[in-house]
Amino acid sequence: GNAVSNIIDKTALSHPEIAFTYIKDGKQVLRTFGDGKLISAIYSVFGKDFAKGLIPVDYQLDAIKVYGYISKPEHSRPNRNMQNFFINGRYIKTRTAMVALEEAFKGSIMVGKFPSCVLNIELPCEIIDVNVHPSKLEVRFINERPVFDAIYHAVKSSLMKYDSRKKASFKKETAFNEVQNKFNPFNNAPAILNKPVVQSSKNDFVQKQYAK
């Protein structure tokens, strides 16, 4: 059931280069294209709306590389269900990554809301111990600080880029509206619109002549 779907979803996300088809009770539940693009796998697993609300992340700090996607601040959620971390290609639950992600989003989203992500973290094997949890779902970092820093800065820099792009497009829109208003003849002569086009004393005289 759900546990199987969950495993297939996570495997598909960690291997966008492999095409997956999952059929349950004769119905196709999941199909990924295997085109090597993470965004394609996300689209297949989580759907179009989720995929459209994402910002790309691509960052390296020393020996640690962080890449994937985070949700736009306006697409935050009421829970952490859509936080997906992969360390060296394996789906992992890690408090360090979760805290780093949420700290980077502080001030960008409302309190009580949570960011979503599909983030790959590549790091040297010697700084992790995967044998903490029987299912190997949790990891312990020999040194948490560099991992926290890499994820925090990766997310923060992507959010800042997104924010500056949003501000730039808002400025562009505002500037365009100002230019339009400047060159709109009706804006400069609003009185014309409120009065009849032809009105003069001569006209009154003509009307009076015909009225006789």
Region annotations inferred by a language model:
Residues 1-212:
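N-terminal phosphate-binding caps/lids of nucleotide- and nucleic-acid-binding domains
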